[in-house]
UniProtKB/Swiss-Prot annotation:
Its EC number is 3.1.4.-. One of its GO terms (molecular function) is metal ion binding. It comes from the Bacteria. This is Probable metallophosphoesterase MPN_126. Its cofactor is Mn(2+). It is an enzyme of class 3 (hydrolase). Belongs to the metallophosphoesterase superfamily. YfcE family. NCBIfam families: yfcE (TIGR00040). Mn(2+) 1 binds at D9, H11, D34, H109. Keywords: Hydrolase, Manganese, Metal-binding.
Amino acid sequence: MTKVLVLSDTHGYNDRWLAVMKLHNPDVVIHAGDHLTTKKFMDQNATFWVAGNHDVVGEEIQMFELEGIQFVLMHGHQAPRHDLKQWYKMLVDQAKSYLCDVLIVGHSHIEHYETIDGIQVINPGSLEIPRNPRKLPTYCNLNLSQGRISDLTFHFPRD
């Protein structure tokens, strides 16, 4: 089993990110952009990461495989943000060309999980600037096992 921490939109506030990493001790850390920090910090603290619309370092899209699962990672600013349902559909349409099983995005600052056209879409929300109705910061943990996501949990830290 592989333990994965997924986060996004930390916007340069790294203390909570580092505390969450210490709390969960993940095997893999995925950051979906708007990190607003240095390449060195990202390389030291994230296994896979992309640039968001506020970042000056990083690739826009990463593709990788974990436990036999094909992932595409992008921030989400690659599609115009209309209503969220339409926005996710546009991102999935882009991701289809990569033949992925899972698409991880950020940008909206709102946690989300659903399957669209056979692709699992995960948005961990924002650890620092949440826009969900409760205005709580969010991140996500995944457990990967035998070619599938065996557990997906959103967390809402209050400290």
